[in-house]
Amino acid sequence: MPATAVQWHIERHKRILARHPEVRALQGTYRPSQAFIVVLVAADVALAWAVRHTTWWTVLALSLCVGAFVAHALGVFIHEATHNLVAHGSRANKLWMLVANLPLLAPAAIEFRVQHLLHHKFLGEVDGRDTQAPSRAEIAFVGASPLRKVASFSLGRFFYRARPANHVPRDGFLVLNWCVQAIATAALVWLVGGKGICFLAVSALLAFGPHPLGARRLSEHFTMRADQPTVSYYGPLNRVSFDVGYHVEHHDFPAIAWPRLRALRNIAGDEYRDLFVFHSWTRLLLAHFFDRRYRVEHYIGFGAILEPSPSGPCPTLKTPGPTGRQGGAVSPNGGNASGMRPPSFV
């Protein structure tokens, strides 16, 4: 394996372009994403307005079953704009990020942009440079305790902000994000009331926390194989998540927008066929919470590698690939080299 996780993706990028030069045509912005952002923002606000006179149970149920999906999709488009894939130029993309941020209440878009680009640059460099890597204090605190794992994952944003690498210096767009969001949140309080705001807040917390969609954060760089720092998800929730599960593909080619990631995998299938993949965010989330083998330090860079049994939540791991390596090689039918297909709930 290359010396760093970043180098692993760089080498794959070069190799894929050498073997499949047509992949270059997939790179570039996808401007229809702008329409998706407008529709999703309008839908989120409309739902918040619709629940203002319903029961609290209805508010919570809709947050879980509908709102979380809308909020998560908006987060996906903030991610797309972070890579300048929604419009031409960084300034236009930052403005679209502010729009997508509106129903999420917390002014997180510009801060995320800075942190996420550093994550790509320093992937797997723990102790301060990879902005998604947990701190050692966080690892020591959480340990294998199911209760602490649930708490840390549910309050992930607060842990995230406490990580040294995630300090974001102030600039004009960061301040603009705060100001625009403060005005938007005040307007939303007036428009949709307490229950509507609760709907928006709970939806956002679930989308990036204790919900099958939130398990995306776990799956992306969970070290299931020593030679693979990034993992994709090929389950059904990609359909409502704008293919954000195609994460190896994304790190290989950050300049390819979401609707073209499947095409990348189809063209360069030889480079993706033998990688470990997840098929169920739900199953991963439950395993992380309640299986004591799953720990925070299974993030790439800490050297901890999970090896569940064949009957466990990730039964592809222990099967030998066609080259004799450990690691659940994925066959063309979506199973693994032994013919065992992972469970694919959601």
Language-model-detected regions and their locations in the chain:
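Helix-boundary and loop/linker segments of multi-pass membrane transporters
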Residues: 23-27, 53-54, 86-90, 231-233
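Acyl-thioester-dependent acyl-group transfer interface
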Residues: 226-227, 337
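Non-catalytic, topology-defining segments of multipass membrane proteins
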Residues: 1-68, 102-199, 259-260, 265-346
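Generic hydrophobic alpha-helical membrane-span motif
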Residues: 47, 85-86, 227, 256-257, ...
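Histidine-centered catalytic micro-motifs
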Residues: 74-83, 112-124, 217-223, 240-256, ...
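Aspartate-rich (DDxxD/NDxxD/DxxxD) Mg2+/diphosphate-binding motifs
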Residues: 76-96
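Membrane-cytosol interface motif
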Residues: 94-102, 229-241
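Transmembrane alpha-helical segments that form the membrane-embedded catalytic/substrate-channel core
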Residues: 68-78, 108-110, 158, 201-226, ...
